[in-house]
Every structure is written in structure tokens, then in C-alpha cells.
Amino acid sequence: MEQSNDGQTAHTLLHLASAEVESLKEGITFLRNKESGKNFIIYKNGEELRACKNLCKHQGGTFIKDIEDLGNRTVRCTKHNWKLDVSSMKYVNPPDSFCQDELVIENDDENGVSLVELSPPNPWDSDPRMAVCLEGGEVQVTYLTHACMDLKLGNKHMVFDPWLIGPAFARGWWLLHEPPCDWLERLCRADLIYISHMHSDHLSYPTLKKLSEKRPDIPIYVGKTERPVFWYLDKSGVKLTNINVVPFGIWQEVDENLRFMILMDGVHPEMDTCIIVEYKGNKILNTVDCTRPNGGKLPTNVALMMSDFAGGASGFPMTFSGGKFTEEWKSQFIKTERKKLLNYKAQLVKDLNPRIYCPFAGYFVEEHPSDKYIKETNLKNDAAELNMLIRNTSDVVTWTPKPGAILDLGRLLIDPTDKNGIIDPPPGTKIFKDSWDYDTYLSIHSFSFDDEIFHYPSWIKEYFTWAGFKGYNLVLRMIETDEHFVPLPKGYNYLVDFLDLSFPTERPERDHPYEEISSRATVIRHVVKHGLLWDDLYIGFQTRIQRNPDIYHHQFWNHFQIKLPLTPPDWKVFLDREKENNATLQNCSIM
């Protein structure tokens, strides 16, 4: 490893001797470093060499040869069939999405070649502090539910991602675990709250509404993402007055012993973040939902690491039908993907080697009776199974949390076998929820369904013009349905051609990709009325999707899930205009 004047380090990941370089064939060659176990891809075009890690940027899958590629330039990910053109380092399926991080090719005097990765300085290494031995009870971590942890750090309390009541993603996700009955008091006494990103299983407006009624000035910290985490706050009706947006990679000092640093995700930097909390030099790493937290560069040997583990946080493939999407195919895909994720998380923990690891942020359930199919199909990883896998291959101490359980960091760092290092809730404590108050939250969607704007079919043009997505060759059919995805007899059923943002009555004659989305009418109308992101539809299992060809349209979904305008459509102006137009037409007919 070499270090430059600017602090950047160069890591040699693989070296090829002269004979190995000469044996490289034109096009793609797959290589493996037997010592590290890491895989790489080299592309040769005459004298030119390009190289990258064999790691899909989407969700960390492995590339294999693309049998459909006759030019020997493209590889296919075994996870979601994403395709990478290694000659350009651009992903071609989906088109116009990511570029692959390229490795540096270095030639030596003996005609050998090294694959080198350049890395900037680790931000957490700035102003380093030696870890001080912690007393028992000095640092305690209490699991509340899902991704919500209550951290006692000396005389300070910090809370992560409070989702304690209500659903997430419209009505698709419900809490699996029953939070401790004093959860609101815990939130109110916190000195600070960290919210990792805008998804509603982390930023829960129903939860924050309860908190704001008692303590609106509580300090909340979020990362400076492209789309603000609290973009919807003004429209939510929740009054919070102390939201702090902080830059990435810079220590935020709380007191002389406590500081934290927020880092961005490498795959979704526009919205996802993770955090390092440091108390007296002891680091707690919480990667939350990040696919490649900090681009895959993370601190090793931390005191405590937390991460997601479960899978199933997407409508794919459960909500898809047609073509290959048979029940057998979906079942096998889900089983395979969960196993891959389990192994990936186990390997990540092994590589980072924390003293203690806790899987969390995956304790949700599709509990509403109308989502019985999703609940039965969308099987998730078991935290205890992951922890067993980790213990079998490392010395890492693992924790499978229960609501109200307390991990005493000081005790476990001193003695991993200390029986008082983890205190489970008392016998008889309710662990799993058995009621969810559906009506309170679903009635909100019903109000939107009956809104006056939907009396005018021109709302369709108004909405998609507001959304601002066009110039893309995709034709979309939207179908409003009932609870069970049966089309409503009087519901809207319409086409949108995004190439010119038109609304034809029939599909155009030109070649075009086609996607058909059936959505529960109450939910899609709620999303439309309030200008919400389509995560409520897709991640919340509120759609059923067919597509031809079977291609993921990254630009389309990325726009509607992340890049919609920050303010909703001006429906008042719309209604005034429509009423005026109708009045004019009536006057003309009378005349």
C-alpha cells in the first residue's frame, strides 16, 4: 500500500506476471486473487486493458459471461440480471443508470500488470482518539423495534430511526415487534435523534407527530442528501423546529466524549446514509439500509456494528406477473436471493470484524389481510440464522434483539461471555404485535380517493406534467383497482407515452417498451394528490406489474421514487381552472 501527498492510498488488488498478461485473450477475462478471494474482470482491446472488481454496483451481485453478447464485451449480474459493458464501464441494462468504478492499470519493468485501487483518506481517521475502557452501564443500547435503537452514551441519549406506530410505505409494512410501552418517554428524553433517510420505516411521520406534540424542539440530525430527508415536513402537519442537516464525512461533536459522523451510500447517495457514533474512542457503526455504505469503505474492528439483514424490502418479484414470473420462479428466486444476502452479510461482518454485531432494520410484516399473498410469498432472512453463520466463521459476538432488550457495551467488550452483557426483557413481555389499528391509517387514503380533483379526467395530464418525466421511450398503462387488484368498473385506466408525454387512447405503432401497473385506487390517488414518491406503491406492495420486454427502466423508477418535485401539484389552481372551463362550456351551450 502506497500513500500520496494528498493522503490518498493505492492498494494493489491483483498482480499478473508477464506470462499471465500475454495469455489474456481479446475481450473479457474473469480473474480471482486466490489469497484474498476477491474477483476481477479485465477487458482487452488490442494493447488497451481496462479492469474492475467483479461486483455489481446495484446490489453487490457477481458477474458472469453474458451468453447473448457476441462481442465479448458484456457481463451479466447473477442477482438481478443487470448488464455491464466492460469496454465502456457503463451499465447497459438498465440503460443510463450507473458507471462501474474502474481500477487503475499499472505496468511494471518486467511487463507485468497490477490492478490498483485508489482510495481517499478515511474520514473517520481524522482527529483519531484512542479507545478508553468503558465501565459497565456506561454505554447501553436498547432495541425498541425495527431500526429504532435507544443509545445511552454516558450522560447522553441518542435514538436511531424512530418508527414506533402506524404503517410504512402507505399500508404495506407494519411493525413486527411490539415496542416497549415507554417508547414515547424514551424519545422525549433523547438528547438527539438520527434519521438515516426518508423512507417511512425510518422517517415515520405518525411517530414524529406524537413526539412533536410533547417536544417539538428535539434536535434531529440528517445527512445532506440530494433530496432532503424532510422534504415533506411542511405538508405533513408535523411541527419540528430543530432539524439539523450536516455534511458527510465530518465529525459532529456532541460533547467532549461523544461525536458522530454521517456517511453517504455508494449506490443511492441522493437519499441513503449511515452513521458512525464514537464515545470515548469506541465506535458504533450503523449501516442501516445502505447497499454499499460509503462506497464499501468502512471502519474495521469497531466495538459494535448494526445492519439490515432480512431482504424483501421491494415489490420485486412478488408483485410481478407474466412471462417468467410464475409462482415457481418467484419462489426459487426469493429463496436464492435471501441466501445470497445472508452470505453477503456474514462475509461483510467477517471482513469488518466488529467486536459485536446486531442484525436489525428488517422486523416488518405485511400484516393487512389484503396482503396475505405478499406475506406468504415474501419470505425473509432469520436474524438468528445469520448470527449463527457469523459465529461459525468468526469470533464476533452476536445479538438477536428483542423489544426492550439491553446490550451493555462496556461489559461485553471486557468479557464477551458476561451473562449480564445482554439483558432480555422480563418474562411475559409482549414481543410480537397482534393488533395494528388498520382503520385509522387506511381511512386517510379513502379521503384522497373521494377528492374533487378526480372528478376531472384532466388530472392525469396535470399530474404527469407536474412529475416532469419525459423524453424516454416507455409507454405506461395505469389501471385503478380495488383491494384485490381487480380493475374498478368506474376507475381510471389510461396510457402515458413518456417519449413525448402524451396520453394516447391506444398504444403507438412504433417499437416501444411497455409497462402495465395496476394500483389500489385509494393509494395511488393519495400519492397523486399529495405528490408523494412512488416508493409507497412499489416498496409498499400496492401494485401489480407486467412489462414487455422484461427490462428494469432505471430512469423511470428512479425519477418517480426519488426525483419528483419537492412540492405537490397545485390542485387548487387546477380545480379553479377546470371549474372555469366547465362554466364557459356550459355558457356556450346555453347560447
From Swiss-Prot:
Catalytic activity, EC: 1.14.18.2
InterPro entries the record matches: CMP-Neu5Ac_hydroxylase_Rieske, Cnh, RibonucZ/Hydroxyglut_hydro, Rieske_2Fe-2S, Rieske_2Fe-2S_sf
Limits of the Rieske domain: 16-114
GO molecular function, one term: 2 iron, 2 sulfur cluster binding
Pathway given in the UniProt record: Amino-sugar metabolism; N-acetylneuraminate metabolism
A Gene Ontology cellular-component term: cytoplasm
Enzymatic reactions: CMP-N-acetyl-beta-neuraminate + 2 Fe(II)-[cytochrome b5] + O2 + 2 H(+) = CMP-N-glycoloyl-beta-neuraminate + 2 Fe(III)-[cytochrome b5] + H2O
Cofactor(s) this protein requires: [2Fe-2S] cluster
Keywords: 2Fe-2S, Cytoplasm, Electron transport, Iron, Iron-sulfur, Metal-binding, Oxidoreductase, Transport
One of the GO BP terms on file: CMP-N-acetylneuraminate metabolic process
Top EC class for this record: oxidoreductase
Free-text remark on how the cofactor is bound: Binds 1 [2Fe-2S] cluster per subunit.
Subcellular location: Cytoplasm
Residues annotated for [2Fe-2S] cluster binding in this entry: C56, H58, C77, H80
Name of one Pfam family that matches: Rieske
Functional description taken from the UniProt entry: Sialic acids are components of carbohydrate chains of glycoconjugates and are involved in cell-cell recognition and cell-pathogen interactions. Catalyzes the conversion of CMP-N-acetylneuraminic acid (CMP-Neu5Ac) into its hydroxylated derivative CMP-N-glycolylneuraminic acid (CMP-Neu5Gc), a sialic acid abundantly expressed at the surface of many cells.
Family in the record: Belongs to the CMP-Neu5Ac hydroxylase family.
Protein's UniProt name: Cytidine monophosphate-N-acetylneuraminic acid hydroxylase
Organism from which the protein derives: Xenopus laevis
Lineage of source species: Eukaryota, Metazoa, Chordata, Craniata, Vertebrata
